[in-house]
A protein has these predicted regions:
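Class I SAM-dependent transferase core
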Residues: 4-69, 120-121
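Conserved SAM-binding loop of SAM-dependent methyltransferases across substrates and taxa
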Residues: 81-96
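Conserved SAM-binding motif I beta-strand of class I
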Residues: 100-105
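Short alpha-helix immediately C-terminal to the canonical SAM-binding loop
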Residues: 110-112
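Short, conserved SAM-binding/catalytic segment
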Residues: 115-125
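Conserved SAM/SAH-binding loop
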Residues: 129-134
């Protein structure tokens, strides 16, 4: 992962993203590529590492500026393949490890992937298999 690209975002830059964090993001890219061969984690059109980095990792990293560090939880509604939730969880390991990231996803297969990634990377996440938007219809 090119630190110059990641460091172009204010909070990420101010905290000087560690080599370890960049390595974890690279591991995530590899896991996405591998699992995407079996199930549709991300668009099949975006399969090269550089495209995944730019389209998903870097785009997702931008949200770090909007995570309120005064709270101990944040959530990603309809996380799909884990963007931005997994990226936030990876970066939060260094910023505020106690923050739990709740990832809501309706796809059973994607939830399994999210749980595998979270466990393998020791992320502070909770994967919730639920169509959150379906619940809102009854409100």
């Amino acid at each position: 992962m090119d630190n110059a690209i990641l460091n172009s975002y204010s909070k990420v830059s101010n905290l000087d993203v560690s080599r370890e964090t960049c390595n974890e993001l690279e591991s995530l890219v590899s896991m996405i590529q591998e699992k995407n061969k079996e199930i549709n984690i991300i668009s099949k059109k975006i399969y090269e590492k550089e495209a995944i980095r730019e389209r998903h990792i870097i785009d997702s990293a931008q949200i770090i500026d909007f995570v309120d560090l005064n709270y101990n939880t944040t959530c990603d509604l309809g996380t799909g393949g884990g963007m931005p939730g997994l990226i936030v969880a990876i970066v939060m390991k260094k910023i505020k490890n106690s923050m739990k990231i709740h990832l809501y996803e309706k796809s059973h297969h994607k939830c399994i992937f999210l749980k595998e990634v979270s466990k393998k990377m020791n992320l502070n996440t909770e994967i919730i298999h639920k169509d959150i938007f379906l619940s809102l219809i009854h409100i």
